[in-house]
Regions:
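Terminal substrate-recognition subdomain of acyl/acetyltransferases
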Residues: 2-11, 17-20, 167-180
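Active-site acidic-Proline motif in GNAT/NAT acetyltransferases
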Residues: 103-109, 137-138
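Conserved GNAT acetyl-CoA-binding A-motif
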Residues: 116, 123-134
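C-terminal "cap" of GNAT-fold acetyltransferases
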Residues: 129, 136-143, 148-149, 159-180
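Conserved hydrophobic beta-strand within the GNAT/NAT acetyltransferase core sheet
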Residues: 97-100, 131-135
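Acetyl-CoA-dependent GNAT
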Residues: 16-20, 26-27, 31-105, 116-118, ...
Length: 180
């Protein structure tokens, strides 16, 4: 983590977010919710109404509970994802990866995979042994990305998202972290 990697578009740095990233994180999150509305259960209008302190608090380190990782090229925020560990003694061994997004012009460069691997590193440092996520069932490129990272489809959540008069199913995916 925090090791830059080269792409055909330039060098990318993946790192944990902090409150100083709040404005750029908000902008990217809102952009993502408009660009790919069926990929997220979050809603653009609701997120738009959040005050600045909401975004700062979201990026405050929560130590063992959760984190957000950002992909940067120079001063531009180009990708993001979050991870949240189970919050009870019976679920602390697992974590949910959420909000994976890379700007369209940066896709195809394995940035999402690097973001996910940063989540894996964070999780393993906290003795988390399994990760899970949900992905829109029609998002073939995201599914392939997650499979390259070690995830496998374990089920379907029918009608997980409702957007503009249509329901969208999510595939539920699981990745054991023991052998990574």
């Amino acid at each position: 983590m925090n090791e830059p990697f080269a792409t055909s578009h330039g060098t990318i740095l993946i790192r944990e977010a902090n409150p100083a990233d709040a404005v750029q994180f908000r902008d990217l999150r809102l952009y993502a919710l408009q660009d790919s509305p069926t990929a997220f259960s979050a809603d653009y209008q609701r997120n738009l109404s959040h005050p600045p302190q909401y975004w700062e608090e979201m990026l405050t380190m929560h130590a063992d509970a959760s984190s957000i990782f950002l992909a940067r090229h120079e001063n531009d925020l180009i990708g993001m994802t979050g991870i949240a560990r189970g919050n009870t003694p019976k679920t602390r061994h697992s974590a949910t990866i959420w909000g994976v997004y890379v700007r369209p012009e940066w896709r195809g460069l394995h940035i999402s995979e690097e973001l996910i691997h940063a989540c894996f590193h964070w999780a393993k440092a906290r003795k988390v042994v399994a990760a899970r996520l949900g992905v829109t069932a029609t998002n073939a490129s995201a599914i392939r990305c997650y499979e390259r990272c070690g995830f496998r489809i374990t089920g379907t959540e029918p009608r997980a998202v409702y957007y503009e008069g249509q329901f969208h199913d999510f595939y539920l995916m699981y990745c054991p972290l023991d052998n990574l």
